[in-house]
Swiss-Prot record:
Gene expressing this chain: PCP36a
Residue ranges of every copy of the Chitin-binding type R&R domain listed in the record: 135-198
Record carries keyword Signal: yes
UniProt keyword list: Cuticle, Signal
Name the UniProt record assigns to this protein: Pupal cuticle protein 36a
PROSITE patterns recorded: CHIT_BIND_RR_2
Single Gene Ontology MF annotation: structural constituent of chitin-based larval cuticle
Top-level taxonomy: Eukaryota, Metazoa, Ecdysozoa, Arthropoda, Hexapoda
InterPro entries named among the record's database cross-references: Cuticle_Struct_Prot, Insect_cuticle
Source species: Manduca sexta
Length: 280
């Protein structure tokens, strides 16, 4: 047993250090998988899986050096973007310099599909801000570094009457602006990019004009259905002299009578023609 322990101790003492040629090359500021999945390693800062300048823990070796990694420079996250690098470090990779794109924007490690635009919005500064409120009314205006501007003024007379504007820079680089008024007539906005109602078809326009003329002339059509000839006597219809039913004494009808009788009475049975059928 003592011999076994002694041999183990001698083996450990005589064990040579693993030569660097059996390990991946040492990382530097421009390559590797560095700062890696969690920022600072368990034995130091700025490296990949291990501590400073080391890999899994061996001094002078490791998978990545300071300032490299999936997320870019120091403090970069796990993603395509980051401060100045993509997959390969500061000098190259899938994205350009300065956090211009990628799923991880800048050193904050936040998700951003818009890349640099989202970073500009998140870091926008207020350039101007004025706000004044009195018993008679109010007025305010502000402007930010990412192109947002707004202003409004209003007075408390017969309710609240106000007017103002709002503008911003879109993702396409164009400026969009809206002006508005709000008073007893409601909220009315104007802007070049706002949708407009389609034109009224010519047939509908003519119908509306005709309805307006009829209403001015006292003709009212409420859309109720009225059958043809309903409530009307006269020459046509089911009534008339010699007809099946009385009427106002017109000329026609179902009956075969001539001039008819006053009041439109039906033809008597004695006056009607008869047909005799003889059985042999």
């Amino acid at each position: 047993m003592k011999l076994f322990v002694l041999a183990a101790v001698l083996g450990v003492c005589l064990a040579d250090r693993l030569d660097n040629k059996y390990l991946p090359p040492r990382g530097n500021a421009g390559a590797g998988f560095g700062p890696g999945f969690g920022g600072a390693g368990p034995k130091g800062g700025g490296s990949g899986f291990g501590g400073a300048g080391s890999g899994f823990g061996g001094a002078g070796s490791g998978f990545g050096g300071a300032g490299s990694g999936f997320g870019g420079g120091a403090g970069g996250g796990f993603g395509h973007g980051g401060a100045g690098s993509g997959f390969g470090g500061q000098a190259g990779g899938y994205s350009g310099a300065g956090g211009a794109g990628g799923y991880i924007g800048g050193a904050s490690g936040q998700y951003s599909g818009r890349g640099g635009a989202a970073s500009a919005d998140a870091n926008a500064q207020i350039l101007r801000l004025n706000n004044e409120v009195t018993a008679e009314g109010f007025a305010y205006d502000f402007e930010t570094s990412n192109g947002i501007r707004a202003d409004a003024q209003g007075v408390a007379t017969n309710g609240v009457q106000s007017q103002g504007s709002f503008a911003y820079k879109g993702d396409d680089g164009q400026d969009y602006s809206i002006t508005y008024t709000a008073d007893e007539n409601g909220f009315v906005s104007q802007g070049a990019h706002l949708p407009t109602p389609p034109p009224i078809p010519e047939e509908i326009l003519k119908s509306l004009e005709q309805n307006a003329r009829d209403e001015a002339a006292g003709i009212v059509d409420d859309g109720t259905y009225r059958g043809e000839g309903a409530g009307a006597g006269g020459a046509g219809g089911y009534s008339g002299a010699g007809g099946c039913s009385g009427g106002a004494g017109g000329a026609g009808g179902f009956g075969a009578g001539g001039a008819g009788r006053a009041g439109g009475t039906a033809t008597s049975a004695s006056e009607a023609p008869t047909t005799t059928i003889r059985l042999m």
